[in-house]
Amino acid sequence: MDRSVDLVKKAIEFRGPERVPVSFTQFKTPGFTTDFPKVYGEDFHFVMGSAFNFNFISETQYIDEWGCIWETFGDTMGEVKTHPLKEWEDLEKLKIPDLENPARYENQKPMIEQNQDKFKMGAIAFVLFERMHHLRGFQQLMEDFYLERENVEKLGDIIVEHTIRVINTYAELGCDAIFSTDDWGVQDRLLISPKLWREIFKPRYKKIFDAAHKRNMKYILHSCGQITDILDDFIEIGLDVIQMDQQDNMGIDLLSERFGGRICFFCPTDIQTTLINNDKELIEAKAKELIEKLGKFKGGFMAKTYPQPTDIGATEESVKTMCEAFIKYGRYF
């Protein structure tokens, strides 16, 4: 029987693992009593050394390590309200957190040792585009793409260099992959034109992916929204796994026909059309469909839960139904 780490690598590389790998989260959801990894299994381990650290400065506001001030909404993460890079003249003075410092990973080492059989993912929150608009402001960054192109590219390069240093730190810890986030789509299109994306972001992502591959690590990117216009580009520059919480706005059939067998998908059932409805029959059917259509390439699909189910109104029973369905149908076709 393969170890979890070997199962995941085989799924990503389309080498016919014995079952679909699952990530049913090592973190407990407030209000849920089920220990999902203990009950249903877990093939992954998140290493969180450079992830999202912050300090509350009021009851509803907190500041992250980059100097962004967030406003919370109930129990949700909230959004950035104060952006530290107000003027481009301040770019040279930008506060870069010391995320590659080995000291901040010391508390992760015992857990890494205990999870050598798992596929270990080093987490980097808000890797490139999201980091840029957190620092500059979303609307302002949109204008900057056309009015301050040189400064935008300088900022992108600073973030890429920083990200590569963090990647190397995770490599030294023995991680098998990098997991990062960058939401690129709204419901029906990209947030910027594909042409602009290819000019500014594509070469910088390639440097990031290449850095991971140089250290023998896979790269997993979370991105929500309609992103089919750039999936071919991501595949071309070496993205190994796309983690998407929505599929129905693009179409599972389309994803399978155009991209199946070329990139590995890492998904829960759709959080907008399926999991949110708490319809057990629909959840089971969609879990089966994801495996049958995206995982019919001797791999190419890995199952996961959604990390904030209560934020979308998903019940504990619905999450259990999804996990059980992924286990029930978790063989490649």
Model-identified regions with their sequence ranges:
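Active-site loop segments of alpha/beta catalytic cores
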Residues: M1-K28, F32, I63, K95-F333
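Glycine-centered secondary-structure boundary/capping sites
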Residues: F14, K38-D43, E65-G67
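A common structural microfeature
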Residues: R19-P21, D43, E59
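Segments that shape or occlude catalytic/ligand-binding pockets
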Residues: T29-F56
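Short aromatic-enriched loop/helix-cap "lid" or pocket-rim segments at secondary-structure transitions
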Residues: T33-F36, S58-E59, G74-T76, T82, ...
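A contiguous, low-structure linker/loop signature
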Residues: I57-P102, Q114-M121
